């Protein structure tokens, strides 16, 4: 249902950080591109991938420097189908940003996290609390700050 906020409860879900998608979309020459691509294909085939709305908006913001308004809106709407993943809590353009308590974000920042990383961590904790994995190339930014196991795409593929 469009606009409906959801909380993911599946146990074997992989929450994917924005940097994984940015490598796929913009950095085909990156040394991790092949592994990154295999990871995204596996997650799509298993239908176990989730991205937080916060991360999707970060991706759109990065792409905004190279895409026009129409392209950005099309990308935003097409993103979940392109990667066969779910956007949580909602992808509706009429939805509100995830409701998060300032205290929860501050608690994460006291663990030495940037505001953007704290938003991601708090969003995952609130809306995807039973995620098994948080998959990122910036493992050092998230390890010890999430309930999910923090792994790189390469580590996920070895499981």
Model-derived features with residue positions:
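Structured helix-beta-strand junction loops
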Residues: 45-46, 82, 130
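Acidic, PIN/NYN-like endoribonuclease modules and their adjacent C-terminal/linker elements
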Residues: 1-11, 121-159
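Conserved beta-strand segments of alpha/beta enzyme cores
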Residues: 48, 84-86, 149
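Alpha-helix capping/helix-boundary segments
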Residues: 20, 55, 119-120, 140-141
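Active-site neighborhoods of divalent-metal-dependent phosphate/nucleic-acid chemistry enzymes
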Residues: 86-139
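Short, well-structured N-terminal submotif of metal-dependent ribonuclease cores
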Residues: 1-51, 64-73, 144
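Helix-adjacent hinge/juxtasegments
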Residues: 62-93
């Amino acid at each position: 249902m469009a606009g409906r906020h959801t909380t993911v409860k599946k146990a074997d879900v992989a929450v994917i950080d924005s940097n994984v998608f940015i490598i796929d979309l913009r950095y085909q020459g990156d040394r991790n591109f092949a592994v990154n691509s295999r990871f995204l294909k596996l997650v799509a085939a298993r239908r176990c991938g989730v991205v937080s709305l916060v991360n999707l908006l970060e991706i759109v913001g990065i792409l905004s420097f190279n895409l026009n308004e129409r392209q950005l809106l099309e990308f935003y709407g097409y993103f979940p189908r392109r990667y066969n993943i779910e956007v949580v809590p909602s992808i509706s353009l009429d939805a509100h940003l995830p409701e998060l308590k300032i205290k929860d974000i501050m608690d994460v920042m006291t663990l030495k996290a940037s505001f953007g990383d704290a938003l991601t961590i708090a969003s995952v904790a609130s809306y995807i609390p039973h995620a098994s994995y948080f998959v990122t190339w910036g493992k050092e930014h998230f390890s010890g700050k999430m309930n999910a196991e923090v792994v790189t795409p390469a580590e996920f593929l070895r499981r």
